[in-house]
């Protein structure tokens, strides 16, 4: 069973481990690089979790004792960040290889969407690398559509992100 944990700054070791695993497993899917974060100290990890108004979520597979106890396995993460004019950003979605196909990504997206609505958001927006078909399919299944606006440059500027959004109204 999958349990979601809303992270606080005290959860920085868990977030660090998940973030490094994501950057190591899927470097093609993120603007940040493993080298950018690999040597970050506790202060840097805590600061990322302390962004005002942000919502950080970890997914854990229950261990034999159940719930998200010490034997639970961290398998995924997602972040929600506040933006201007009612826009909320979905960022850093990742699910580890052993947990893929179990609905973990669906649960993470549903939780960030719940937060976005509860925090007064009118739009949930994301950026994804063109060609990342598993992610694009996931986002479309959750009601996101591609916007005409160009995304930011990706990996040296050769590729631009695909911007997708979903109305929360």
Placement of each model-derived feature along the sequence:
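Extreme N-terminal starter segment of soluble prokaryotic enzymes
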Residues: 1-5
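Acetyl-CoA-dependent GNAT
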Residues: 6-98, 106-111, 115, 150-152, ...
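Residues that form or flank phosphate/diphosphate-binding pockets in enzymes
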Residues: 14, 103, 134
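Conserved amphipathic alpha-helical interaction elements at protein-protein interfaces in regulatory
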Residues: 25, 114-118, 134, 145
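Short coil/turn segments at alpha/beta junctions that flank glycine-rich nucleotide-binding fingerprints
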Residues: 86, 102, 118-122
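Active-site acidic-Proline motif in GNAT/NAT acetyltransferases
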Residues: 96-98, 102, 130-131
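Short polybasic/polar patches that bind polyanions
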Residues: 100, 117, 140
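C-terminal "cap" of GNAT-fold acetyltransferases
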Residues: 122-125, 129-136, 141-169
């Amino acid at each position: 069973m999958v349990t979601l944990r809303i992270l606080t700054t005290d959860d920085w070791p868990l977030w660090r481990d998940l973030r490094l695993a994501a950057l190591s497993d899927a470097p093609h899917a993120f603007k940040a690089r493993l080298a950018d974060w690999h040597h970050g100290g506790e202060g840097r990890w805590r600061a990322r979790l302390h962004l005002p108004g942000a919502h950080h979520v970890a997914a854990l597979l229950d261990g034999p004792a159940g719930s998200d106890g010490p034997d639970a396995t961290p398998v995924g993460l997602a972040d929600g960040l506040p933006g201007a004019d009612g826009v909320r950003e979905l960022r850093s979605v990742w699910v580890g290889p052993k947990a893929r196909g179990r609905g973990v990504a669906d649960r993470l997206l549903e939780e960030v969407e719940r937060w976005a609505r509860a925090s007064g958001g009118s739009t949930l927006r994301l950026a994804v690398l063109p060609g990342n078909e598993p992610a694009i399919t996931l986002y479309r299944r959750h009601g996101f559509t591609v916007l005409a606006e160009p995304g930011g440059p990706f990996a040296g500027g050769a590729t631009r992100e695909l911007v997708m959004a979903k109305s929360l109204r």
